[in-house]
């Protein structure tokens, strides 16, 4: 198991950033080389279940799919649970808050890999922060450019 905490300072509105983050149908825009397909399986007021087809491009080049449940705990807090696949049982918590006119995005990862894929732990530890930073930076740029009603 790998547990990681990351914090990112983003130059955008918290509300607009969170709106983009929870616009699941458009997530592939921020992960064009990785997220090949995203299908919403079940949608409710406070949670959404999605299935993604992902292509990993690190040491191994492999496509896989996973289902995940994304629960909106509050207006600034998401909880993600991976329901199947090699990382079944992994949890990610994403929370945002405004601080000095910046959005602070805190991410807590609790990653559980199957025995077959445990060799990926060092890669995940090494690559995760920069991967998230790239995604969140793209989202914050779009949030900053978004219209006020967004």
What are these regions (language model features)?
Residues 1-45:
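Hydrophobic ligand-binding cavity/cleft-lining segments
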Residues 1-7, 47-49, 65, 77, ...:
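Intrinsic-disorder/low-complexity, polar/charged segments enriched in Ser/Thr/Lys/Arg/Asp/Glu/Gln
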Residues 6-8, 37-39, 65-71, 90-98:
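Hydrophobic/aromatic beta-strand elements that line small-molecule binding cavities or substrate pockets
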Residues 13, 43-45, 75, 99-102:
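Short strand-connecting beta-turns/loops that link adjacent beta-strands
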Residues 16-21, 27, 50, 70, ...:
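Hydrophobic pocket/interface hotspot
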Residues 25, 128, 132-147:
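Short amphipathic alpha-helical signal-transduction/dimerization elements
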Residues 39-83, 138-144, 150:
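Glycine-rich portal/gate segments that line the openings of hydrophobic small-molecule binding cavities
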Residues 82-133:
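Beta-strand/loop substructures that line and gate deep hydrophobic ligand-binding cavities in soluble
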